[in-house]
From Swiss-Prot:
Gene Ontology CC: ribonucleoprotein complex; ribosome
GO terms of molecular function: rRNA binding; structural constituent of ribosome
Protein name (Swiss-Prot/TrEMBL): Large ribosomal subunit protein bL20
Reported function: Binds directly to 23S ribosomal RNA and is necessary for the in vitro assembly process of the 50S ribosomal subunit. It is not involved in the protein synthesizing functions of that subunit.
Family: Belongs to the bacterial ribosomal protein bL20 family.
Length: 119
């Protein structure tokens, strides 16, 4: 059985990891052993934060809608409840955009929500 030398495979694996660690600080971008740990940790952070991003954007949208609806005299929860009663189905992402960029339209939505709450 011939002897198998694994230099080519090892070099390729090391290059792959060091390429992924490019731009990291200090030994994390130069030393294979440290770079492996850094790349694994970065992958864990990326996996976690892809999920957190969805939560954080929803929080941002709610904060923006709340601020805009309070300027029009209605709390966030009552505003959303009013929209549901008025059977206006606009998601929070679009509501937040309207609240920031088109205050007149948002004010009319708040008025419709108020009307639905008083009925």
């Amino acid at each position: 059985m011939p002897r198998v030398k694994r230099g080519v495979t090892a070099r390729a694996r090391h290059k792959k990891i060091l390429k992924l660690a490019k731009g990291y600080y200090g030994a994390r971008s130069r030393t294979y052993r440290v770079a492996v740990q850094a790349v694994i940790k970065a992958g864990q952070y990326a996996y976690r934060d892809r999920r957190q991003k969805k939560r954080q954007f929803r929080q941002l949208w709610i904060a923006r809608i709340n601020a805009a609806s309070r300027q029009n005299g209605l709390s966030y929860s009552r505003f959303i409840n009013g929209l549901k009663k008025a059977s206006i189905e606009i998601d929070r992402k679009i509501l937040a955009d309207i609240a920031v960029f088109d205050k007149v339209v948002f004010a009319t939505l708040v008025e419709k929500a108020k009307e639905a709450l008083t009925k």
